[in-house]
Structures are given as C-alpha cells and as structure tokens.
Amino acid sequence: MDGAEIARRFGLSGTARLSEGPVARGRQGVVWRLDTADGCWAVKVPFAPCTEQEMRWSTEFQEAAHRAGVPTPQPRRTSEGCVFAQIGGTQLRLYEWVDLGEPDAGLDPALVGEVVAAIHSVGGPDPRPVDPWYREPVGADRWDDLVRQLLAHGAPFADRLAELGDELVELESWLEPPALVRTCHCDLWCDNVLPTASGGVCVIDWENSGPADPSQELACVLFEYARADAGRARALVDAYRQAGGPAGVSRPGHFSMLIAQLGHITEIAATDWLQPNPRSPDRAGSAAWIGEVLDDPHTRARLLGLLDAVNAPRP
C-alpha cells in the first residue's frame, strides 16, 4: 500500500509513513499504522469488502458516540466524505490512532458499566431487523452434525464440544425476541473494550453496530466482565444504572443475545477448524478461539447466578 496516497485521499498533510506491515490482526481484518504531520492513524483493511451503505449506520453511530464523549477513536472520512477508499485494489478506512493495552476481562467493572451506559444513551430506536447472529439458535441438529464432523476429522476439542452439546441446546430454549430495539455496539467483548495508558478504556470495532436490545447487550457485558464474581456483577450494573443506563438484566431471556452470539461463534470457530480461511488461517488459531467458550462456558447455572447477584437487594 502507498502511505502517501492514503494520506492524500483522506486529506492529511505532510510526509506520510506507513508501517512495513500490519501492526494488529482481528477476525475481520488487519490494521496498519500511518504517521503523518496531522497525527497518527490506524488504517483498517477488512478481509471481506463492504459497501458504503453497509457501513453508513455503524460509522454514524461511532461518530455520534465520539461527540457524546464515549472513549472511542474518531473515524476519519475521505476528502469526499466517504468511509472507505479504494487504493491499489485495496479497500481501507482510517481511524485516529490510540495506544491500547491487551484485552483484559478484569477491567474495573464500574468503569465498564459507565462506558456501556454512555453507549446506550447515544443509541436511539432502530427500525432495522435484528441480525439472526444475535437472536437465532444454532439448533440441536446442527450441533450434532458439527460434532460428528469434528470427531471424524480428529479435532482435539471435539469430545469437549460433545460434552457441552446438551447444555448449549438447553440454553437455546431461553431465547426470546428483543423487547426494546435500539442501536447498540453489539460487540463489547474485552477484545474491543481495551485499557489505555491513562487508566481508562477505549471502545473499538464498531462495524457490527446495529439493532439490538440494550438489556440483552448488558447481559453479554455482565458475563464477559463478571463471570462468576457476584461482587463484580453488582458493581458493573450499579455503575451502569447510576450513569443513566436505560437497561436492566432481570430474567433468563435477557441472556438471549449472549446465548445466540456465543453459539454462533462456537459454530464458526469449529467450521473454521474444518476449513481454514483468511479469518482463521490455521487450525491452532481456530482451536484457541473455540477454547474461549469451552474453557469457561456460559452454563445455565452460571447465568442464573449472575441474575441472582444483580437482582439481590443492596445493603
């Protein structure tokens, strides 16, 4: 890629220096660093090309969140006001550069709660349909078929997935439609809520933003940052409420987004192990990805424990 051409297309002045290669890699793309007289920028190159229309809502939502004070990198548009530029056959976009730490599910739960409340306060009613990724089950037949394929190909995690299969199916019986649909981030795992050098956090990767139930997204956050720790769960929810967050987690169905999303992540990771691809180019990476669920599963008992924790009377 040509750093000078990237700078020109995005209206950046002075000498431009592009990193020799990607400095970060995620499931959806890679990130390069661009240094210019107008500051440092993250150049994001998606694995799967997107259209301007597909990214319009999510980019506007991130821009609105940035204006409202949510700690997130500001997107940089091209000189023509576009999200993407096509340079040398490569589709890319720019964000302001932020120095970030490693993913940490042990972040201060109160800080996480405050940030999620701020995001939910930005998002308004969203008329679009909720993506099946966040609401549909994988289904017993698909789980059984996947386990059979993994066992036949000698996947090292196949037996563990088979043991968890009945639990995954029972969890899917909890699924309920979203009650209140607003624009949400939809991807607030610890990979995307990262610590900063100043002691705060920065929320990245807004590409999946879209319609969802804030209560269901809050339940995802609750599991990710509290797990089985009742004290962390209460601290997160209390901070969320005190910061004006509009949602609550009060029944098993509020874990619908978590159950659907982790189910589909598990399915995709297993499928990637069977068929490596640019998102998961090697089987070791796919095995590690599915291990994130198998090593610390979201069982009904754990989720009910979180419900009890956040709904218990406070002293």
Residue ranges of each PLM-predicted region?
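Short Pro/Gly-enriched beta-strand edge/turn motifs at strand-loop
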Residues: 11-18, 166-177
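Active-site acidic catalytic loop and adjacent metal/ATP-binding pocket
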Residues: 25-37, 42-43, 75, 169-218
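ATP-binding pocket architecture of kinase catalytic cores
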Residues: 36-128
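Active-site activation/catalytic loop segments of kinase-like enzymes and analogous catalytic loops
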Residues: 214-246, 260-278
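Conserved NTP-binding catalytic cores of kinases and kinase-like/nucleotidyltransferase enzymes
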Residues: 1-79, 196-198, 308-315
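All-alpha amphipathic helical-bundle segments outside canonical DNA-binding/catalytic cores
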Residues: 247-258
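ATP/Mg2+ or Mg2+-diphosphate-binding catalytic cores
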Residues: 137, 145, 149-153, 267-315
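A cross-family kinase active-site recognition segment
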Residues: 103-159, 179-181, 284
